[in-house]
Amino acid sequence: PHPPPPPSPPIDMHSHAYRNDEAGIRQWVKTLDENNIEKVIVHTKAFGEEFDRLYDLFTGISDKFEVWCGFDMTKWDQPEFPECAVKELERCFAKGAGGVGELIDKGLGERISSSGREVGLHFNDPKFDALFEKCAELGMPVSIHSGDPIWMYEPLDSHNDGYMNAKHWWIDLSVPGTLDLDGVVDAFVECVERHPNTTFIACHLLNLNHDYARLGKILDSHPNLWIDISE
């Protein structure tokens, strides 16, 4: 038998534009209805015309989708980056973006969604300050994927408990400028501390599923930080 419905309808806080065709999205809505899921947060990490396209597509089909944008990293290495990126963030918000995500730093800094390139800017870099402060002003939560599970940073040998995943997602710490997991988490926590009025969501348990004691201490000391339990 189908399990009884939960006391409150669940919200899927971490999804992506896995389907971006009308038929696929309508089937998705049918699945949501069948399982009493109230809403899905669609992390597009997009901006500009691509964000507008995805926003119109999803929200034009169902109000179950809340569509989030990304940061415009186009001018990340130029002095005008903060001003230009904030302007685009405001535009996306006016369009209907409910938040920002999923931003990613696995060790080499924020990843540009259009190219997959990691640009060496960690989220505690002052270049992001104006963006995170604008998120606080607009009430836009920020979802950040910091690091990967610890096994992705360990040697690929018989002692690696997560070898089956690590062999596909291994992170080479010999690449110059790469932070290990502790370094990525520290950079993220510094960012959270620097922007106490901004709501942050740490994806995947902040990738500290090997150290819940540390995760608990971080959560206890940062009231503006939430986690999602997606894996």
Go through each PLM region and give its residues.
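Short, acidic/polar
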Residues: N20-L32, Q78-C92, R214
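Active-site gating/metal-coordination segments in enzymes
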Residues: F51-W170
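Conserved, mostly hydrophobic/aromatic
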Residues: H14, L32, C92, V100, ...
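Divalent metal-dependent hydrolysis catalytic cores, especially in the metallo-beta-lactamase
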Residues: P10-S15, Q27-E49, F65-D72, G98-E102
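Short, well-ordered coil/turn segments that N-cap beta-strands
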Residues: P6-P10, N36-I41, I61-V67, A94-G99, ...
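Catalytic pocket-lining loop regions of alpha/beta-barrel enzymes
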Residues: R117-E231
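Active-site-proximal beta-strand/loop segments in catalytic clefts of secreted hydrolases
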Residues: M13-H16, H43-K45, G70-D72, E102-D105, ...
